[in-house]
């Protein structure tokens, strides 16, 4: 593994381990943060907690019996029986060829615990925290969109810039935030990201993978087709985990929306407006005479960066996936950049 790739994975793993997230201009969130041990009942999932076992205390087995779950640890078995625990599984599923480094980071010690939803989350947190083998217990906060259902397009200016442009994509003339010469109405020259100068150095490389942790990407979009995908799976064998990451046929990424499947979700990406917009900003094909330009969309011939979809939202504002699992998935997929334009107000301690 390249050292840059390894450092990127470690960075994302540490972010996942500490369970932190930053807020962005497109926030999704919940109620104000609550004191530790007293999660808001409006934002914390009922009947579910996230625990981290101490080193060497992870259950060797979890067996379902008529009387409940059995782990081989008497104190733990008594506690989960008292709570009415119905399911317990790793937060981060077995990672195939990445399992060794997953364990080195201690991510294999995080477990989700499902219990009787009528029981108090606060009481369950305290009961599990008292167990000798438990390092910490956290609520699982719900993530909900607080913005509009759909983006509202701002009126386009009547005039567009007329100066020569680096690529022939028709929408580039209106992407003033890339390079602003002040010629458009109400424009301020230089209020941009200076992208045209950056393109003189590089317009992106298909050796670079960007994980888009957001709504699903429309991988068949005419300005994105060919720039979204996991090549090992795309050209691999159907029904086989060709890249050895623990996920089968994740050709375009993975849909992490909650389900009973394990690993959570499925390989069926559901296109979402915001996720597709974000992917286009990153990797829309440059120089194809279609749509807009991507910041790292290359110089034609799919020479720009590749993106993979780590889907955690749908157009249904009540659907959401597990963000920290999505982050790790992207890192294991070789992403050196994880794009996240979302956030929440409650954070993990």
Label for each model-derived stretch:
Residues 20-41:
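Bacterial Sec-dependent N-terminal signal peptides
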Residues 212, 219-220, 227-273:
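Extracellular calcium-associated, cysteine-rich motifs in secreted modular proteins
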Residues 11-21:
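Bacterial N-terminal signal peptides
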